[in-house]
Amino acid sequence: MKIHLDLDCYFVSAERTRYPFLKDKNVVVAKSSDKKIFSKDKKQGVILGDTGAFNSVLEFRNHYDANNILKAWRDEFLDENGEIHGIVIAKSYECKPYGIKTGTPLREAIYMCPNLIIIPSDHLFYQELSQKLKAYLEFKIPVLEQYSIDEFFGDLNGWIKDSDTLDFIKDLRDEIKAKFDLPITIGASCSKWIAKLLTDCVKPFGVIALEQEKVFDYTKDISVDDFPGVGSAIGKKLSDYRIQTLAQLRERPNLLYAYGKTGRDLYERICGTDNDKVIPYSDRSGMTPKI
C-alpha cells in the first residue's frame, strides 16, 4: 500500500514541542509584515536553500524574554499606535469552537477568543523540525516523498504486507509522537491520492488503511471539492452539472475526460485506479496539477 502522513496543526504542534505550556490552550501562529528586513537592529538572518519541498527563503530568528514571553509574542504584531496587525496562518484544534480559521485577521481572532495565545511564525524552526522528521522517516519507509513541510507520501509495497499495514502505521504514528512529540495522522490505500483523502477523514491523530474494494463505498459521500487536484475551474463546472460527491462524479467520467490527459488522470485518481508513484521530491513531476 501507499501511505500519506500529515502532521496535525503542524506549526502549532511544533511550537508546543519547545513550549509545553501551550498544550490544550487556544493557540494561533500568526504572520505580519516583516519589518525586520529593512531594520537597522541587529538580527540573525539565515538563507535557506532549496531543500526538496522548499524554495530558498530568507528567515530571521527572534529571541524573546522568557520571563514575559506571551507579551513579547503579542508585541510582535503591534504598530507604533498600539494597533494589532497580522493574519492567522495556523490554529490549534482548541480554537475551532470559536470559529477562528486560517486567514482570519488577528484583530478579529482576538475578539472571537479573548484568551487567545498568539505566536509569531518561525518558519526556520518549522523547516528544521520537518527535516529531522524526514530523516527519521527515511529509515522507516523504503520510498519516501516529501509533499510539503508537513506532509509525506510513502510506498510500503514489497516491504509491509497489505494485511499488516494498519498495525504498521499505528506503530509509526505512536513512535513519531513519542520521539518528536508531534501528533500525526496517517492514511493508507493502493493509491497515494486516496491515502491523502483518507487522512483528512480521520484527523486528528488517526490512522486508516483501506483496501481498493472498499474505496468507493467509504468515500462516496465526500465532496468533490475535497479531492486533491480538483481546482476552482473544474469545481465550478461540476457544480453546474449538480455533481457534488465523488460517487456522482465517478458515474460521469466524460465530465473529466473533456480536459484531456489531465482530466483522465484525475478520474483515475478519484477511482483509486491510478498508478502514480511515490517519488523523491527532487523529481517535481510528481506534483498533481489542479484543473
How should each PLM-predicted stretch be described?
Residues S232-I291:
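DNA-contacting surface of Y-family translesion DNA polymerases
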Residues I149-D155, C190-A195:
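Short, conserved phosphate-binding/catalytic loop or strand-edge motifs used
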